[in-house]
Swiss-Prot record:
Cofactor: Zn(2+)
Enzyme Commission designation: 3.4.24.-
Coiled coil: none
Similarity comment: family membership: Belongs to the peptidase M23A family.
Protein name listed in UniProt: Protease LasA
Function as written in the Swiss-Prot or TrEMBL entry: Involved in proteolysis and elastolysis (degradation of the host protein elastin). Has staphylolytic activity (degrades pentaglycine cross-links in cell wall peptidoglycan), preferring Gly-Gly-|-X substrates where X is Ala or Gly. Enhances the elastolytic but not proteolytic activity of elastase (lasB) and elastolytic activity of other proteases. Degradation of elastin is likely to contribute to the pathogenicity of P.aeruginosa.
Any single Gene Ontology cellular-component annotation: extracellular region
Keywords recorded for this protein, A-Z: Disulfide bond, Hydrolase, Metal-binding, Metalloprotease, Protease, Secreted, Signal, Virulence, Zinc, Zymogen
Active site (catalytic residues): 317 (proton donor/acceptor), 356 (proton donor/acceptor)
Organism this protein belongs to: Pseudomonas aeruginosa (strain UCBPP-PA14)
GO biological process: proteolysis
Free-text cofactor note: Binds 1 zinc ion per subunit.
Signal sequence segment: 1-31
Propeptide: 32-236
């Protein structure tokens, strides 16, 4: 592969155009891909998802794996309320964290589709999410529904950003990404008795409140907040001195092209990195926290670190995790190593082509584009497609030295920007 040097691209003036640099137009996976295309919304489809005039949209932050999910002890909740599901705790936590969907959302949908969690019958264990998924088996349905919710959520955000960039009104109907994702999924499974007619989001909100005691004022949000939130999100980038690269200071690793968390669709929130991109069974190296924050161990192979500001980073395909839930870490604290064994790297299933770290950027539980994000002195330009490795479009720009660094070339980690 030939890597060309290029000058840093000028930043567009509009935050919506800035965000559009991260919209997906295809691409080929190098290391990690769920294999499903992005969910595409249209005006016609959205016309079928109108909120009832008396309904309020759901709070995005309670839909996503953000502060509320991080404070939720899923294993303890299942032990008390659903002992038959306790052995599924890590599986639920892992995939909820991977798709960054609050596990409370999943449990609420289970109750709506198959009844109380306390004593599920054989049918409920085989198909806990009923007609919301065409898959069979507990694990398959759980992952399928989380994947559907994620695709719908980010597909809606992408559609809104395109509309805003075209100077079309967005958010005025009060429909936000969380509401669109859940409403669309529930109406897909409308033959299930729990969501026949009426307001399926109302039934969802009531069930959520009953299960977790969340006040309506927290679960719902005013309609007029939707457009403001979109505009704020379009211009998001972490503070330039908050993060470093996720490997040891003083070392050089090779990152690949930016891509979505799943390898297809929007936003380009992630990149994969490895010391030397070896085969399975080869030596692997230390993964460190890119910034200070609180640890959440999502599974044996996945960790998240969340800064008090709401910025977070996710670390997947891990091994030898040496931090624990609630632990406070600083930048460059060792979290573990990236796994050299495929079964360890994919501790709850999935796909991967070889040993590497899958690294993602989030804000308040939502995956956000790496466009313009700084890691030490390097500012990222994400390119125009998933896994875009062309250095004319995707690169790390060293703001101190004025140099451009391409994909699959060693990238030195000097630490945090001064």
């Amino acid at each position: 592969m030939q890597h060309k040097r290029s000058r840093a691209l000028a930043s567009p003036r509009s935050p919506f155009l800035f965000a559009l640099l991260a919209l997906a137009v295809g691409g080929t996976a190098n290391a990690h891909d769920d294999g499903l295309p992005a969910f595409r919304y249209s005006a016609e489809l959205l016309g079928q998802l109108q909120l009832p005039s008396v309904a309020l949209p759901l709070n995005d932050e309670l839909f996503l794996y953000g502060r509320d999910a991080e404070a939720f002890d899923l294993e303890a909740y299942l032990a008390l309320n659903a002992p038959a599901l306790r052995d599924k705790s890590e599986y639920l936590e892992h995939w909820s964290g991977y798709y960054s969907i609050n596990p409370k959302v999943l449990l609420t949908l289970m109750v709506m589709q198959s009844g109380p969690l306390g004593a599920p019958d054989e049918r409920a264990l085989a198909a806990p999410l009923g007609r919301l998924s065409a898959k069979r088996g507990f694990d398959a349905q759980v992952r399928d529904v989380l994947q559907q919710l994620s695709r719908r959520y980010y597909g809606f955000e992408e559609y809104q950003l395109r509309q805003a960039a075209a100077r079309k009104a967005v958010g005025e109907d009060g429909l936000n990404a969380a509401s669109a994702a859940l409403l669309g999924l529930l109406r897909e499974g409308a033959k299930a008795s729990a969501v026949q007619g009426g307001n399926p989001l109302g039934a969802y909100a009531q069930t959520f409140q009953r299960l977790f005691g969340t006040p309506a004022a927290e679960l719902l949000q005013p309609r007029n907040r939707v457009a403001r939130q979109l505009q704020a999100k379009a211009a998001l980038a972490p503070p330039s001195n908050l993060m470093q690269l996720p490997w040891r200071q003083g070392y050089s690793w090779q990152p690949n092209g930016a891509h979505s968390n799943t390898g297809s669709g929007y936003p380009y929130s992630s990149f994969d990195a490895s010391y030397d991109w070896p085969r399975w069974g080869s030596a692997t190296y230390s993964v460190v926290a890119a910034h200070a924050g609180t640890v959440r161990v999502l599974s044996r192979c996945q960790v998240r670190v969340t800064h008090p500001s709401g910025w977070a980073t996710n670390y997947y395909h891990m091994d030898q995790i040496q931090v624990s839930n609630g632990q406070q870490v600083s930048a460059d604290t060792k979290l573990g190593v990236y796994a050299s064994n495929i079964n360890t790297a994919l501790c709850e299933g999935g796909s991967s082509t070889g040993p590497h770290l899958h690294f993602s950027l989030l804000y308040n539980g939502a995956f956000v584009s790496l466009q313009g994000a700084s890691f030490g002195p390097y500012r990222i330009n994400v390119g125009t497609s998933n896994y875009d490795n062309d250095c004319r479009r995707y690169y790390f720009y060293n703001q101190s030295a004025g140099t451009t660094h391409c994909a699959f070339r060693p990238l030195y980690n000097p630490g945090l920007a001064l």
